[in-house]
Structures are given as C-alpha cells and as structure tokens.
Amino acid sequence: TTGTVGSSLTGSYGNLTLNSDGSYSYELDANNTDLQKISTGEYLYETFTYTITDEAGQTATAQITIRIEGINDAPSAVNDKETLDLDETSEITNFDDSSKYVKANDTDVDQMDNISIDSVRSGKTNESGSSITVGSAFTAQYGSITFFADGGYNYTANSGLRDSLKPGEKIYEYFTYTITDSKGLT
C-alpha cells in the first residue's frame, strides 16, 4: 500500500503518519483481535518502507519497524444459571462435565492465560453475603455448595427442602465468583 507524506497509512496493527521533517506517529488499532491475543512478553512487529528524495532527485529507501509489546488483559466472566428440579434430584454435580463449569463461558483474550476461580461469595454481588473458601463446603440458605478452582462445583439441597415448597414454587440461591488469570488480573 502506498501512502502520502502527512497522511495516515493503515498497516496490519495500526496507522502510521510520516511527516516531511522525518517525524512520525503510530496509533494502534485497539479493535484488532491479533493485538488483544498477545500477552506480556510477546511481541508483534509492523514494518513500513518509505522513500526519500533530495533536491537533485536522488532517492533512498529505508524502513520503520514498530515493535508492539503485549500486555496482560483481564479475564471476562459471564453469569451462569443452573436449575435444580427437586422432583428429580437434590444434587447438582458437574465434576465430570467441564462444559458445565462456571468458568466454561468465561474468557481471557490472552491466548496462553489460564483462568481459575479466585474467590466466591454467597449473594448477588461481591460485596454481599459471606465469603466461601474455594474447595471447602459452604452451608447456604437452601443447601450446601463446594466450588473448585477449576470451575466445577457440587450443590446439595437441604434435606426436607422439597417438602417445604408449595407446588410450582421457585426459590433462588445466588453465588458470586471472581476469576483470576495466571498473571493475577481479575
């Protein structure tokens, strides 16, 4: 692609503006998915070739190479919902089905980053309810739950809960979890 001095030239990862005095500016394309994938310690390079001409019409060609250093992006958590039909069972166990883990739909754009469950609380927000220790059973309002760092969990409804509900009655139990990537961002 050919550009004009003083105008923006679009590259693979951003836009370069080269001025007639030799100065230049480079602006990254924040929406570029390739840029989002690189993590701390990883690099991408973008090279632009330019030609200069002197008053006698003599030309020379050179290159500007931009080194783009990756940064650690925070992971993104997505709300999960599980339904327990007490007419069928009193327990939710998903140890053997990772597609049902709470972190199965959570992501981190850094390709090599691993996500783990860092903390859990009872309630709808991080500020509400009680702290739950990952890996330990917690007695909640309607049952007992154990969350695991890999996103698996086990929930067992309280004994007698089924008999205490009216036909068709629905109750809700909320838990809030925080995920952390391998570099400590949540």
Task: List the model feature ranges, each with a label.
Residues T1-G11, A60, A74-F138:
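Extracellular ectodomain surface segments
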